């Protein structure tokens, strides 16, 4: 669990959406540096209004996990995370009993019972056995904890907000784990045999945790009952314009030249045939962060090879792209109608650079920028 900041107020995203204030929620997301695709954000709002979990699938690095993290950051929400992996057990997700503490409890009461009159021992031990299953001995997993926190938030509806529960890389869960999640996802309750009270969680759709399930569609196909408990979205690779918006938002201190280099370079790499794994938005952000950190002002062969490690992640791919160095440098340093005009509309100095160069950069030598220019 990642707790919220107790020194800051919480914002309930479900309440914003139910009150017709989706634009405020969108702005909160953008202020964290994450720019959601409009269609994905619309689907998320439907998930909030319905109370259903939101299932998002897509390629790695497309922003599936970053979306709920941005919501949690923007709204100051507690975050619970279940990370998919081999061998994940139900007890790690929902609950388990602290058997050692229960055993200690019973030993202590058995010792105490020896000092009591025979007429009192039976009732005393019967009560001890019942209380062995009280809440104090219950260990909640991340999913169980999320539903429990949501129930607690209903006691302070004006100031508290439900947590976000991220079921990450659900295609690695396996059938038994998916089955264990069906009841909480549908009923909002986690039934615990022998527990005093019988369950944890909250049944009201508008009070449940905000559940976001992600899938890379790699390991195994999710079961129909599991999928049916969700609102669904597909995270596609963003358009170049959308990628520029995201890069600008995530790296606001980067110069226009650095943004242009990163966008053109990665766009060119994605256009090269023969790669097994193409760089995603995640790699674009990493590359731009590196450019900003190093105050990159020009992109030549030495620099390009130094940054290969951020977006070329296999030996075969490196060998292939090294053969394309001249092409990559040409594209990264040339005029790109989408990238350069998008930047020119937002930066007067970049617009002036385009005008002074005739809007076409033919060679690397024509595109050497001093850091002080931007």
Predicted regions and their residues:
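C-terminal regulatory/interaction module of P-loop NTP-utilizing enzymes
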Residues: 1-374
């Amino acid at each position: 669990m990642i707790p919220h900041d107790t020194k800051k107020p919480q914002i309930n995203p479900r309440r914003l959406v139910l009150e017709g204030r989706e634009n405020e929620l969108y702005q909160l997301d953008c202020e964290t540096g994450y720019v959601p695709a409009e269609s994905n954000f619309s689907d998320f709002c439907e998930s909030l209004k319905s109370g259903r979990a939101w299932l998002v699938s897509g390629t790695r690095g497309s922003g599936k996990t970053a979306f709920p993290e941005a919501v949690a950051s923007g709204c100051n929400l507690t975050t619970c995370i279940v990370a998919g992996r081999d061998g994940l057990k139900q007890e790690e997700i929902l609950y388990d009993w602290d058997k050692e503490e229960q055993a200690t409890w019973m030993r202590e009461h058995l010792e105490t019972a020896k000092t009591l009159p025979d007429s009192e021992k039976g009732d005393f031990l019967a009560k001890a056995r019942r209380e062995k299953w009280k809440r104090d001995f219950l260990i909640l997993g991340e999913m169980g904890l999320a539903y429990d926190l949501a129930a607690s938030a209903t006691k302070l509806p004006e100031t508290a907000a439900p947590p976000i529960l991220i079921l990450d890389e659900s295609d690695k869960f396996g059938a038994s784990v998916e089955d264990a999640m069906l009841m909480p996802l549908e009923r909002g309750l986690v039934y615990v045999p022998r527990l005093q009270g019988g369950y944890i969680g909250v049944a009201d759709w508008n009070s449940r945790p905000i559940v976001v399930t992600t899938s890379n569609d790699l390991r195994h196909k999710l079961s129909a009952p599991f999928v049916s408990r969700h609102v669904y979205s597909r995270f596609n690779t963003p358009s170049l314009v959308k990628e520029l918006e995201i890069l600008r938002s995530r790296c606001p201190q980067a110069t226009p030249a650095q943004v242009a280099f990163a966008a053109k370079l990665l766009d060119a790499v994605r256009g090269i045939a023969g790669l097994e794994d193409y760089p995603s938005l995640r790699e674009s952000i990493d590359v731009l962060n590196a450019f900003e950190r190093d105050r990159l002002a020009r992109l030549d062969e030495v620099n390009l090879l130094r940054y290969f490690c951020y977006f070329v992640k296999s030996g075969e791919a490196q060998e292939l792209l090294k053969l394309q160095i001249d092409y990559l440098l040409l594209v990264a340093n040339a005029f790109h109608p989408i990238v350069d005009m998008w930047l020119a509309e937002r930066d007067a100095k970049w617009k002036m650079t385009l005008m002074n160069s005739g809007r076409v950069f033919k060679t690397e030598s024509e595109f050497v920028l001093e850091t002080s220019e931007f």
